[in-house]
């Protein structure tokens, strides 16, 4: 996943930027975000207003439930190869969305989740409703299954926070990020002398790459294999990966078993292992390309020992996603070598 478009350079805020929410929407536009899905809520009415009144702002997709909004963002990212945004109303909207956010986390999908909260100033709260809808740390609801979260408390902090969220969600392995903005921050006028920062100064980190020694070792093992099989997982995330896998399979003459978490290999290709029985059972070497769950396809073969044991070459980003809260990391698989 890479950023789309070239954000503008640093500039003083033009007259069109009057409110905090205007600056937030400007960042969405600079990031190349084309669509925003949400179930309307009062805690982000400022952002909603700026989306409606800013020419060229991301298109709005109205939803009846927050889980639908986040699920739309998940599907969009998988189809378009870039994130979209979903707006979530306060504590209750975030709670509604939590299951869909966990789905996106498990699916390694990039998305910008933007929530409203407060007012944090108790003097500005309406009786009852604003109190039960405000949390001390709202992100704690989903902190265990997002890559990063933040709640900037002034406009001087919003730009860097947004840039960090964008680079974090787009870096591999991908995942959702959550930003939370106080109602007052959105609806207050921009401070005098406000300079709108360029998020283009903060590029997405390059994806991890294996060491040359690991590549040479993998090549030696694959060339020596009698019945190599490629097991494909998240390697199909980008078009260039799709084409590279076809070239690798053809160079090795190795069938490819696509696990289906992404469309990694053309099912009509002669080396497609779709529906072909016995491939993994008879393989002497399996090259697993970013497969998180190996126990299902390989089963008891993971426990083989001796000269005829399966040689598993595990190339994966999964360890970089590891968190302590859920066991979505799957069983630890023994391998000849694990390469990131």
Task: List the model feature ranges, each with a label.
Residues 2-340:
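N-terminal alpha/beta PP-like core and its mobile active-site loop of ThDP/TPP-dependent enzymes
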């Amino acid at each position: 996943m890479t950023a789309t478009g070239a954000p503008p350079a640093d500039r003083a805020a033009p007259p069109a930027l009057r409110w905090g929410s205007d600056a937030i929407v400007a960042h969405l536009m600079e990031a190349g975000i084309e669509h925003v899905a949400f179930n309307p809520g009062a805690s982000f009415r400022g952002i909603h207003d700026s989306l409606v009144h800013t020419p060229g702002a991301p298109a709005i997709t109205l939803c009846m439930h927050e889980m639908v909004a986040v699920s739309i963002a998940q599907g969009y990212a998988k189809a378009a190869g870039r994130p979209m945004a979903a707006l979530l109303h306060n504590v209750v909207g975030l709670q509604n969305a939590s299951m869909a956010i966990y789905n996106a986390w498990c699916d390694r999908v990039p998305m910008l989740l933007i929530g409203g909260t407060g007012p944090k100033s108790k003097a500005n709260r309406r009786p009852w409703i604003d109190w039960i809808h405000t949390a001390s740390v709202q992100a704690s609801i989903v902190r265990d299954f997002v890559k990063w979260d933040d709640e900037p408390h002034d406009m001087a902090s919003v730009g860097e926070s947004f840039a960090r969220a964008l680079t974090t969600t787009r870096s591999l392995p991908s995942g959702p990020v959550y930003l939370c903005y106080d109602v007052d921050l959105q609806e207050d006028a921009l401070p005098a002398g406000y300079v709108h920062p360029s998020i283009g100064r903060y590029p997405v980190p390059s994806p991890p790459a294996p060491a040359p020694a690991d590549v040479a070792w993998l090549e030696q093992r694959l060339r020596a294999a009698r019945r190599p099989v490629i097991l494909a997982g998240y390697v199909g995330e980008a078009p260039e990966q799709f084409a590279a896998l076809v070239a690798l399979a053809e160079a090795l003459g190795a069938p490819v078993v696509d696990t289906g978490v992404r469309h990694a290999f053309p099912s009509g290709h002669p080396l497609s292992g779709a529906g072909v029985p016995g491939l993994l059972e008879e393989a002497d070497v399996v090259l697993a390309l970013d497969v998180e769950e190996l126990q299902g396809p390989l089963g008891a073969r993971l426990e083989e020992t001796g000269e005829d044991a399966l040689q598993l070459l595990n190339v994966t980003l999964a360890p970089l996603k590891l968190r302590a809260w859920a066991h979505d990391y799957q069983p630890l698989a023994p391998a000849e070598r694990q390469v990131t």
